[in-house]
Amino acid sequence: MTDERGNFYYNTPPPPLRYPSNPATAIFTNAQTYNNAPGYVPPATRDNKMDTSRSNSTNSVAIAPYNKSKEPTLDAGESIWYNKCVDFVQKIIRYYRCNDMSELSPLMIHFINTIRDMCIDTNPINVNVVKRFESEETMIRHLIRLQKELGQGNAAESLPSDSNIFQASFVLNSLPAYAQKFYNGGADMLGKDALAEAAKQLSLAVQYMVAESVTCNIPIPLPFNQQLANNYMTLLLKHATLPPNIQSAVESRRFPHINMINDLINAVIDDLFAGGGDYYYYVLNEKNRARIMSLKENVAFLAPLSASANIFNYMAELATRAGKQPSMFQNATFLTSAPTRSIRLPLI
């Protein structure tokens, strides 16, 4: 009876032997050949050795040290695109947090809105409205009960009486967050001293704003109005596209700060070109101030002061004398404000 396992291993070329004196390749056709030869190993023993060598090789592979040089790295092109994506995500976050569109082009805004619409369409948010109060009387009783409960809070009692001008709900919710951010010195736990200092500083600020409002006969501006004016000014300085909500706010003229910005720009134009005063000196920098003074001197040299005070009318009359036909939508002031006396003006 032949050894089938032995025939299986012996009919295939074995790996190179350990010692160089032995032949590199050998083919055995029978498992019983050279049984008595020196150095002969039975098949079972050889199988055990092969299993042991396999386990050793497996262990050596398992405990092989980690080669950091084989770790995949980003090339230059992928790094550039990665930085662009991160920068674009930061712009999107800034756009949704503070409505800052100064660094976004109309195409980028359209792309952001498209992504938002796709997310809403694919995964809409479920909104459940629960009617908590059956009538207005029930709601009023609930608010009275909350006022009594919040009036007995420990946070309100820990503050000095001269600095606690806020309601208890404000002290329990908003004031600790404000004190933690600005008056706690970076500590993890909020201290009573930081809470008291924040309340004192806010009290002084509100008292000052109230006194100034009463003196100037102007109500205290809401933070929304001030933030809207700041966003509007930022967009103007960046030459960015105004969003629809700010455009409607400008057209409505319901926000005093935005009206002041627009009125200031229009007043500067009137002072420069329509015969106004010299108050624009405070607004312009030295370079533009020198330009405007040179322009006014050159125009005054070309025509008398009575004719060149209003540069718009002066240029319109020069164009009309040169043969330009006024359009049907042109303002009538350009046609009727010419001087009654005939003044010969040189053509530019």
Swiss-Prot record:
Sequence intervals crossing the membrane: none
PTM annotation, UniProt: O-glycosylated; contains N-acetylglucosamine side chains.
MF terms (GO), sorted A to Z: structural molecule activity
InterPro entries reported for this sequence: Baculovirus_Gp41
Pfam families linked to this entry: Baculo_gp41 (PF04700)
Protein's name according to its UniProt entry: Structural glycoprotein p40
Gene Ontology cellular component list: virion component
Keyword Transport attached: no
Species of provenance: Bombyx mori nuclear polyhedrosis virus
UniProt keyword list: Glycoprotein, Late protein
Source taxon at top rank: Viruses
Similarity field: Belongs to the baculoviridae gp41 family.
